[in-house]
Amino acid sequence: MAAPVVTMQNLIEAGAHFGHQTHRWNPRMKPYIFGARNGIHILDLSQTVPLFARALDFIASTAASGGKVLFVGTKRQAQGPIADAARASGQHFVNHRWLGGMLTNWKTISNSIKRLKTLEEQLSGDTSGLTKKEVLNKTRERDKLEMSLGGIRDMGGIPDVMFVIDANKEELAIKEANVLGIPVVAILDSNVSPDGIAFPVPANDDAARAIRLYCDAVAQAATRGGQQARADRGEDLGAAVEPVAEPALVEEAAAPVTEDEQVPAEAAAETERQSDA
């Protein structure tokens, strides 16, 4: 089963080679840094391409064996792409604040998910027996639970692999995955440590276009793996009532920048970092 291919050209067009300012680097990323330009580290994409290919192969094979993929990215510019990619591939996601114990205390989390589903049933049914205040309180509780747990409501247990955007911001999620022996695929910018990451992918983790590229590629790998799993079970994929749609091609996510969009990638990435701070 062929995983999607992300080329060096795709990565360059998305600005994936631009790291942080040199004074903000993490020395443990030195093996993945090509050099510096205008005070900004340049990541070595000749390593990124094969490392990402290896990670995508692992995700595809995990999904093909029936495994669950958890997408994690809570920073502002990652929230949309993370949710879109997980939904498109029939997988799971966390794109708001990571709750402590979300994996290591799964029993408590699963009880909260049950509460979410109960509230949804109550609010979608006849609420005439409730006061306006009771309806309002239940609605607020449901919305809060949906924001935190909606992306994992159907996961049914801990995932088999975790994909992370921004290893610094998602440090707690990675620690929980490490405790449970869950392999982590992570996009690593020049300011993070690769420790605890089974599948490191050195690349910019701030530029919105680059994040979309990574998420689409992982979604495509998970989709192909899931299709293989269903085929192995003898399911007729063509007869599915609502077949899982394969995400847009990776090449489309990294389409050339138009003249109207043309902004130096360094400036764009730095602007997004500052606004997310």
UniProtKB/Swiss-Prot annotation:
Entry's transmembrane regions: none
Keyword tRNA processing listed: no
CDD domains: RPS2
GO BP annotation list: translation
Keyword Ribonucleoprotein: yes
Keywords (A to Z) from UniProt: Ribonucleoprotein, Ribosomal protein
Region (Disordered): 226-277
GO molecular function, one term: structural constituent of ribosome
UniProt similarity note: Belongs to the universal ribosomal protein uS2 family.
Protein name: Small ribosomal subunit protein uS2
Organism listed in the record: Sphingopyxis alaskensis (strain DSM 13593 / LMG 18877 / RB2256) (Sphingomonas alaskensis)
Protein's gene: rpsB
